[in-house]
């Protein structure tokens, strides 16, 4: 990655705004994915692209300081969540990865569906973010 001048005000401002929009859309896709197109995979790709945009708009060192994640550990954590989510069905005699859902009344949101697919999607979300950023940042660090 190249070193940017400290007076790139337009680039930094647009990066912040566009990153916020991408992250908000990523969260929407993550939660809408149960019944509509989206879910953990595409939400993870959108989040990874937003973080990559931050790496491109600012210098890599300051972003690593602001976001101190080890993305390889994020991959492992996401895999553990996705794998262990499936064991819930086995505990009650159903097949692996059986999905359960229930509707609950939540004061502000009204009737809301809570499902066991959400933690599985969270695991996929973390795996996709971790893999995408590990690959991209490894390539970027080799070019430096």
Swiss-Prot record:
Chief location bin: membrane
GO (cellular component) term, any one: plasma membrane
Transmembrane segments: 9-31, 41-58, 75-97, 117-139
Keywords recorded for this protein, A-Z: Antiport, Cell membrane, Hydrogen ion transport, Ion transport, Membrane, Sodium, Sodium transport, Transmembrane, Transmembrane helix, Transport
One MF term in the entry's GO annotations: antiporter activity
Keyword Ion transport: yes
Biological process, per Gene Ontology: proton transmembrane transport; sodium ion transport
Family statement drawn from the similarity comment of this UniProt entry: Belongs to the CPA3 antiporters (TC 2.A.63) subunit B family.
Assembly: Forms a heterooligomeric complex that consists of seven subunits: MrpA, MrpB, MrpC, MrpD, MrpE, MrpF and MrpG.
PANTHER family noted in UniProt: NA(+)/H(+) ANTIPORTER SUBUNIT B, NA(+)_H(+) ANTIPORTER SUBUNIT B
NCBIfam families: PRK12573.1
Protein name per its UniProtKB record: Na(+)/H(+) antiporter subunit B
